[in-house]
From Swiss-Prot:
GO molecular function annotation: RNA binding; structural constituent of ribosome
Family to which this protein belongs: Belongs to the universal ribosomal protein uS9 family.
Domain of life: Bacteria
Organism in which the protein naturally occurs: Burkholderia vietnamiensis (strain G4 / LMG 22486) (Burkholderia cepacia (strain R1808))
Top-level taxonomy: Bacteria, Pseudomonadati, Pseudomonadota, Betaproteobacteria, Burkholderiales
Family matches, as NCBIfam families: PRK00132.1
Protein name according to UniProt: Small ribosomal subunit protein uS9
Length: 130
């Protein structure tokens, strides 16, 4: 807890989100912009709001987010993870329901590296019999 703000760090792929929440009327600001202006896809907006809707805190908190790295989906996942951790910092009794929904665990999937002699991580050159 920093002042009257609760804090949570979220990560997904190469995106890192620093999330600050405090009691308010439901405003979500991401990198200085309203959330609807920052995330263009409806699915990204849905992903970010999932922990708030699960805990019935949709209009309870003002949320300020700094996020960098990654693409839109990775950033949305990082913000969701950060909001989850900030909610747990605010009220530890929310952890079991958030954990059952799978929001507490960091999604550890990362991009697999490209291997020498292959086109991509696993895609080999086309094989020709003759």
């Amino acid at each position: 807890m920093i002042g009257n703000w609760n804090y949570g760090t979220g990560r997904r792929k190469s995106a890192v989100a620093r999330v600050f929440i405090k009691a308010g009327k439901g405003d979500i600001i991401v990198n200085g912009k309203p959330i609807a202006d920052y995330f263009s896809r409806e699915t990204s907006l849905m992903i970010v709001r999932q922990p708030l809707e699960l805990t019935n805190h949709g209009q309870t908190f003002d949320i300020k987010v700094n996020v960098n790295g990654g693409g839109e989906t990775g950033q949305a996942g990082a913000v969701r993870h950060g909001i989850t951790r900030a909610l747990i910092d605010y009220d530890a009794t929310l952890k079991p329901s958030l954990s059952n929904a799978g929001f507490v665990t960091r999604d550890a999937r990362e991009v697999e590296r490209k291997k020498v002699g292959l086109r991509k991580a696993r895609r080999a050159k086309q094989f020709s019999k003759r």
